[in-house]
Design a protein with these regions (language model features):
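Conserved GNAT-fold acetyl-CoA-binding loop/helix
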Residues: 22-42
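Conserved catalytic-core motifs of GNAT/GCN5-like acyltransferases
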Residues: 70-76, 80, 122-124, 134, ...
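A short helix-loop-beta-strand connector motif used in the catalytic cores of GNAT acetyltransferases and
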Residues: 43-55
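A short beta-loop-alpha structural element at the N-terminal edge
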Residues: 2-16
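Conserved GNAT acetyl-CoA-binding A-motif
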Residues: 106, 113-125
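Conserved beta-strand in the GNAT
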Residues: 55, 61-70, 86, 91
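Conserved acetyl-CoA pyrophosphate-binding loop and the N-cap/start of the following alpha-helix
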Residues: 96-108
Length: 153
């Protein structure tokens, strides 16, 4: 097994893994074709710039991945560099699960993030992933704010 950052050559596999992840997480994806057509361009624009993707390979096949999306915003005492990260799309193909691959990828992410000047990494955890994230140092967050959103499209 080889653990490394994804490169531009991995765009097709990353697109496929993202779609599989979304289907497992959400069920039926109504805009699947649009997502499939748009993701390669997104990866070309962002990969290894403000999107780091850590992958596990079995030969050339990517069998697990973890994404770190880096955003720069006005600094605050809670993110003093102004750069925050969001961990997402942590996914392992079913036949490779429970072997520690996701933990290795998360550890790589946490070691690499300070080199990217990231102050803090946040994530939303499923029940399945909760213990994994706790094991690498993530903590539950109690906030005084309400999480809100508005859907525009």
């Amino acid at each position: 097994m080889k653990f490394e950052k994804a490169t531009i050559k991995d765009i097709n596999m990353l697109t496929d893994l993202r779609l599989v992840y979304l289907q497992e997480d959400l069920g039926v994806i109504t805009d699947k074709q649009l997502i499939q057509e748009s993701l390669p361009g997104y990866y070309e624009k962002h990969l290894n710039k403000d999107l780091m993707v850590y992958v596990a390979r079995d030969d050339e096949d990517i069998i697990a991945c973890a994404f770190l999306l880096i955003v720069e915003k006005p600094m605050s005492p809670s993110f003093i560099t102004g750069k925050t990260g969001t961990a997402l799309n942590v996914y392992t193909k079913p036949e490779y699960r429970n072997k520690g691959y996701a933990k290795k990828l998360m550890t790589m992410m946490l070691e690499d993030a300070p080199e990217q000047d990231v102050s803090v990494i946040e994530l939303k955890s499923t029940e399945d992933g909760y213990l994994l994230y706790k094991s690498v140092g993530f903590e539950d967050v109690v906030v005084k704010y309400h999480n809100m959103k508005i859907v525009l499209k």
